[in-house]
Amino acid sequence: MIRAKKHFGQNFLQDEAVLNKIIQAIPKDTQNIVEIGPGLGDLTFKILQICSVTAYEIDSELFALLGKKFAKEVQNGRLKLFCKDALEKWDEGGVSEQGYFLVANLPYYVATKMILSAIDDEKCRGLVVMIQREVALKFSAKSGESEFSSLAILANLQGSCELLFDVSAQCFNPPPKVVSSVIKIQKSKILLGESGIFKDKFEYEKFKIFLKIAFASPRKTLMKNLSAKFDKFELNTLFAELNLSPAIRPHELNVELYLKIFENLKEDNERQKRRKSGSLAGQEQ
């Protein structure tokens, strides 16, 4: 009998009703799924009924068990099974060579990092994952809610994020000490490129830095947070143009407004650079 290992954050989901609800949340046109931490293979078994699976299991003991349990699927290519850390695969270039949908019961200690990696991965079409409820609320929060943060903006940037349902600790073996929730992110927009939200990865990374500044102190006003890095006069002008109160707080804006503020500050910065380079050229003459 295989026991859950604490250092891998293992809690095996074995409730039939919950497993079925996760399957029902997967888009009907999905052809390729990536599963992280398949564990004993209960969810894997159900996913294989609808499409092919690429699974990453870091535990060598479970990897061997899964290889035996799904020997037929591995042999015919319906299941690609790797004994590897999925985060390392993302760092190396990606968890799949083709477009995919992520479905997983994620280990709590790396859930946020894995979701952000999937959000950044242009091959990922979306995800249905189970995580700690506290983290789920941060990703699925709506503008105006106190939990609304940079995580919610990134989760909704390319589409939508919603909390589907909560899962009792009794649905797992062993039962975790927290309540879990299943969230769904469905991407509908292109992230990078000419028709994308950002022209390239460099600009996207700058946007993420901008969000860190904006939410540096959530209880302070957005103006106060941004003025630590940007010109106060330009911020006042921009807020007036967008009809934003100087007293507005970071969680009270929506994704579109954050994109507008970022775009305007980027254009102001580029204008300043052009003016500086022009004045330097004049001095040299």
UniProtKB/Swiss-Prot annotation:
<dbReference type="InterPro" id="IPR011530">
    <property type="entry name" value="rRNA_adenine_dimethylase"/>
</dbReference>
<dbReference type="GO" id="GO:0052908">
    <property type="term" value="F:16S rRNA (adenine(1518)-N(6)/adenine(1519)-N(6))-dimethyltransferase activity"/>
</dbReference>
<dbReference type="InterPro" id="IPR020596">
    <property type="entry name" value="rRNA_Ade_Mease_Trfase_CS"/>
</dbReference>
<dbReference type="InterPro" id="IPR023165">
    <property type="entry name" value="rRNA_Ade_diMease-like_C"/>
</dbReference>
<feature type="binding site">
    <location>
        <position position="105"/>
    </location>
    <ligand>
        <name>S-adenosyl-L-methionine</name>
    </ligand>
</feature>
<keyword id="KW-0963">Cytoplasm</keyword>
<keyword id="KW-0698">rRNA processing</keyword>
<keyword id="KW-0949">S-adenosyl-L-methionine</keyword>
<comment type="similarity">
    <text>Belongs to the class I-like SAM-binding methyltransferase superfamily. rRNA adenine N(6)-methyltransferase family. RsmA subfamily.</text>
</comment>
<feature type="binding site">
    <location>
        <position position="57"/>
    </location>
    <ligand>
        <name>S-adenosyl-L-methionine</name>
    </ligand>
</feature>
<keyword id="KW-0808">Transferase</keyword>
<dbReference type="InterPro" id="IPR001737">
    <property type="entry name" value="KsgA/Erm"/>
</dbReference>
<feature type="binding site">
    <location>
        <position position="11"/>
    </location>
    <ligand>
        <name>S-adenosyl-L-methionine</name>
    </ligand>
</feature>
<dbReference type="InterPro" id="IPR029063">
    <property type="entry name" value="SAM-dependent_MTases_sf"/>
</dbReference>
<dbReference type="Pfam" id="PF00398">
    <property type="entry name" value="RrnaAD"/>
</dbReference>
<feature type="binding site">
    <location>
        <position position="85"/>
    </location>
    <ligand>
        <name>S-adenosyl-L-methionine</name>
    </ligand>
</feature>
<dbReference type="InterPro" id="IPR020598">
    <property type="entry name" value="rRNA_Ade_methylase_Trfase_N"/>
</dbReference>
<feature type="binding site">
    <location>
        <position position="37"/>
    </location>
    <ligand>
        <name>S-adenosyl-L-methionine</name>
    </ligand>
</feature>
<dbReference type="GO" id="GO:0005829">
    <property type="term" value="C:cytosol"/>
</dbReference>
<protein>
    <recommendedName>
        <fullName>Ribosomal RNA small subunit methyltransferase A</fullName>
        <ecNumber>2.1.1.182</ecNumber>
    </recommendedName>
</protein>
<feature type="binding site">
    <location>
        <position position="13"/>
    </location>
    <ligand>
        <name>S-adenosyl-L-methionine</name>
    </ligand>
</feature>
<comment type="function">
    <text>Specifically dimethylates two adjacent adenosines (A1518 and A1519) in the loop of a conserved hairpin near the 3'-end of 16S rRNA in the 30S particle. May play a critical role in biogenesis of 30S subunits.</text>
</comment>
<dbReference type="GO" id="GO:0003723">
    <property type="term" value="F:RNA binding"/>
</dbReference>
<keyword id="KW-0489">Methyltransferase</keyword>
<keyword id="KW-0694">RNA-binding</keyword>
